[in-house]
Swiss-Prot record:
One of its GO terms (biological process) is aerobic respiration. Belongs to the MTFR1 family. This is Mitochondrial fission regulator 1-like-A. The gene is mtfr1l-a. Residues 9-30 have a biased composition (Basic and acidic residues). GO terms for cellular component: mitochondrial outer membrane; mitochondrion. It comes from the Eukaryota. The keyword Transmembrane helix does not apply.
Length: 319
């Protein structure tokens, strides 16, 4: 009987209340069989709930083992340089901390101490490894400076064109002054009403244009320059123009070679320079359309045409 009572105790714990306790209350007497079939789980009164018992059962049956840890073995022949706290190769956080300043030949990371130059004697292997793993900013600056050469050549060509236009205007003024003085002072020129009417009209109009084009030339400079002959000045300007064109062609060839060899050029700067050149061309074309008669080339040709048309053929032969 004792063994039967002991066997009945787990059933009580598993299924809950005893039959005697169920029949003591009047409600238990009314529904006696229903109370008998009620199941109360074992983990109802435990604070951890049902998940803990399930996980424990699953974990006890599964062969779970911890992961193996990596073990490092120190070689006896290695130097003490490899056992320092600083890493050999810079990490991603050290990319901005590039020590290519002060003309140093090695790259350092943030964790490195900054030694004195006379004390720091790195091995060639360390220098090669650091320089190959970390980019050098100075090389990039030199490349960018080389890539800016086309823009510099374009600015230089625009400055040369401006100087050439100033020289043309000066020569036109000198030739006009020489032609007017020679034609008025010579006795071989027939005095006509049309000539007298045409030359005074041409003088003030030309002075107004030259005063607008050339504003920084004084009267003393004009007197000094007027001593030279017009033919020598024209020849010198032609030779100067040819030399400028050859220099511009060389600059263009250099810029083309640079643009072909360096495909990653700074295209924004080159495009800005080209845009400036286009604006200068448009401005010059607009001025030529508006002031076509004020062009120095037209003035020179007109003065020479009047000079040789007004003079006698005998004077032309003598000249």
């Amino acid at each position: 009987m004792a063994s039967l009572g002991a066997a009945a105790e787990p059933e009580r714990n598993l299924f809950g209340k005893d039959e005697a306790e169920a029949y003591e209350s009047p409600e238990g007497r009314r529904s006696g069989r229903k109370k008998r079939t009620k199941i109360v789980p074992v983990w109802e009164n435990k604070p951890c709930g049902s998940s803990r018992s399930l996980v424990r059962r699953i974990g006890s049956h599964l062969p779970l083992k911890p992961c193996t840890r990596a073990c490092f073995e120190a070689l006896p022949s290695a130097s003490n340089l490899y056992f320092t706290d600083t890493p050999m190769v810079p990490t991603l956080a050290d990319i901005k901390w590039i020590a290519a300043d002060d003309d140093e030949t090695y790259a350092r990371v943030r964790s490195d101490t900054r030694p004195l130059k006379h004390k720091w004697r790195p091995s060639p292997l360390l220098v090669m490894q650091r320089n190959s793993s970390v980019p050098n900013l100075k090389m990039k600056e030199e490349k960018m400076f080389c890539l800016k050469k086309p823009g510099l050549s374009l600015n230089r060509s625009s400055d040369i064109q401006e100087e050439l236009s100033i020289l043309r205007s000066q020569i036109a003024r000198i030739v006009a002054g020489d032609s007017v003085s020679s034609c008025l002072g010579s006795d071989s020129i027939p005095v006509n009403v049309d000539l007298e009417a045409s030359l005074p009209d041409y003088g003030p109009s030309y002075q107004s244009t030259t005063s607008f084009v050339i504003s920084d030339i004084t009267e003393e400079d004009e007197l000094d320059v007027s001593e030279y002959s017009s033919a020598s000045l024209v020849d010198s300007t032609i030779s100067l123009q040819r030399q400028i064109e050859t220099n511009m062609s060389d600059d263009d060839e250099d810029s083309m070679c640079l643009s072909k060899s360096n495909s990653f050029a700074d295209m924004m700067g080159i495009l800005k320079d080209i845009h400036k050149m286009k604006l200068n061309r448009d401005w010059s074309n607009r001025n030529q359309c508006l002031h076509k008669e004020e062009d120095p080339v037209n003035l020179i040709s007109e003065v020479l045409r009047q000079k040789f048309a007004l003079c006698d053929p005998d004077n032309v032969n003598n000249e």
